[in-house]
């Protein structure tokens, strides 16, 4: 009796499935099929035969591409999303428009969650799903008879095409890390970002021309060094230490590097990281072709080279107002940071530049900045006359002027940051002319000269008093 009922039900299911195959479009068929199979699997009698049912009724295979996998960015996700976004925009009903910097036209992309694609005579379906936390998964569905073509050829094709489209329309991004207290699961984004559109270039950078050329040559060698780094057995990365007084152009230099190489920037805030494990997680979630920046590293960590023995080489900092709260301490060891710079973990990624900046080079631990770890030390000091001429060209469109000689003489005697020079040269209003801007700079230089002379005299007087006091003692 039960066998007859089951046979009758099975015949009905066959008829229903055949009808669905004929009437409904593919995406709807797949959705109905999923509901149909899940219903069958709830029937106790059918559980023993569920695999056979699924194989019979579901000839489709599904591959999921999550945005994040095990705390790391899934590097296949973005190229696939780009490829699908650009797919047949002339036929799509919903589009997204954006404009890349220095591009004359708009970049149009699909803004639909479902896309059908064809490749070498086979048909596949893509669907984008977003969970409650906002993290995305791309689902690829195809017939099982196409498995070999899809897995061996199609996916690779899609990723390469997506990368090619990205290279043409790439938007650089400026990332900053989320506090570790906001990391909820392995899918949580460690970084948030905005589009990076800084105008700085090496052409507009105010610095000694010879030093500028040296940096450009070094960056070019790095950018073209894939085979060389592989040959010598080193990770394809480069470290730069930028040091000098405030206002000398360290942040501008980083922006110029990014624009030159078309790299995104990861601005790493170390005080938001609790320990070495979190440091590894967040750094392995960065992309290739990027610049990882730790600005004012002497302020971020205790790297003065005078760590107390009882702290066992431990760098400690506390959030403001939490000095007495043990739970709010953040711990990162020097070895943990160094391990990512040039240890085993440094190989996790390619084409990466690591930049440290500091206003106080002498405060840093020698182990952090030794040659080979930070490959190039770049001093960005006070404004020279050559740097001034670059700024004068940028701000006033001047190659020469009668006041240049006086400015050159004052700059030999006075320390002034390039940022201060730029502030004086910038036109305050429409009536300000070149003469007015240059005279403003001369006045600023003369004021600084007086202050610096007074400071020198004060220092000499103080030193003389100390010497005299010692003479009286002995």
Swiss-Prot record:
The enzyme's E.C. designation: 3.6.1.-
Record key words, sorted: ATP-binding, Hydrolase, Magnesium, Nucleotide-binding, Signal
Entry's induction text: Induced in roots by salt stress.
Stated name of the protein: AAA-ATPase At3g28610
Protein residues bound to ATP: 244-251
Superkingdom of origin organism: Eukaryota
Family, per entry: Belongs to the AAA ATPase family. BCS1 subfamily.
GO process terms (BP): response to salt stress
Cofactors that this protein relies on: Mg(2+)
Range of residues in the leader sequence: 1-25
Family annotation (PROSITE patterns): AAA
């Amino acid at each position: 009796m039960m066998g007859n009922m089951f046979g009758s039900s099975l015949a009905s299911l066959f008829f229903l499935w055949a009808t669905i195959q004929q009437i409904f479009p593919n995406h709807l068929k797949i959705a109905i099929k999923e509901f149909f199979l899940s219903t069958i699997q709830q029937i106790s009698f059918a559980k023993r035969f569920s695999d056979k049912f699924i194989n019979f009724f579901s000839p489709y295979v599904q591959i999921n591409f999550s945005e994040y996998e095990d705390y790391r960015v899934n590097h296949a996700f973005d190229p696939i999303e780009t490829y699908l976004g650009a797919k047949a925009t002339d036929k799509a009903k919903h589009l997204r428009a954006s404009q890349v910097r220095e591009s004359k036209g708009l970049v149009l992309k699909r803004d639909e969650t479902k896309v059908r694609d064809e490749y070498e005579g086979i048909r596949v379906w893509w669907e984008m799903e977003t969970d409650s936390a906002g993290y995305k998964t791309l689902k690829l569905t195809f017939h099982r008879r196409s498995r070999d073509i899809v897995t061996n050829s199609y996916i690779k094709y899609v990723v390469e095409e997506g990368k090619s489209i990205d290279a043409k329309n790439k938007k650089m991004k400026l990332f900053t890390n989320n506090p570790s207290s906001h990391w909820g699961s392995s899918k949580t984004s460690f970084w948030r970002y905005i589009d990076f559109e800084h105008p700085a270039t090496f052409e507009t950078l105010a610095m000694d021309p010879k030093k500028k050329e040296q940096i450009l040559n070094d960056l070019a060698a790095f950018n073209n060094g894939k085979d060389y780094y592989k040959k010598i057995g080193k990770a394809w990365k480069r470290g730069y230490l930028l040091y000098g007084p405030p206002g000398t152009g360290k942040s501008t230099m980083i922006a110029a590097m990014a624009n030159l190489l078309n790299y995104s920037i990861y601005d790493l805030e170390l005080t938001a990281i609790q320990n070495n494990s979190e440091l590894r997680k967040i750094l392995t979630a960065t992309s290739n072709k990027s610049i990882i920046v730790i600005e004012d590293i002497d302020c971020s960590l205790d790297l003065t080279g005078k760590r107390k023995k009882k702290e066992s080489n431990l760098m400690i900092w506390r959030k403001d107002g939490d000095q007495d709260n043990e739970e709010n301490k953040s711990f990162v060891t020097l070895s943990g940071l160094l391990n990512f710079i040039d240890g085993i973990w440094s190989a996790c990624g390619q084409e990466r530049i690591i930049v440290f900046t500091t206003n106080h080079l002498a405060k840093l631990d020698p182990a952090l900045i030794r040659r080979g770890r930070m490959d190039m030390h770049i001093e960005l000091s006070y404004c020279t006359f050559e740097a001034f001429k670059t700024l004068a060209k940028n701000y006033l469109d001047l190659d020469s002027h009668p006041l240049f000689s006086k400015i050159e003489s004052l700059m030999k005697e006075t320390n002034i940051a390039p940022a201060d020079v730029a502030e004086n040269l910038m036109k305050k209003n429409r009536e300000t002319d070149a003469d007015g801007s240059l005279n403003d700079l001369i006045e600023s230089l003369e004021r600084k000269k007086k202050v610096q002379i007074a400071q020198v005299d004060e220092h000499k007087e103080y030193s003389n008093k100390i010497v005299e006091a010692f003479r009286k003692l002995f």
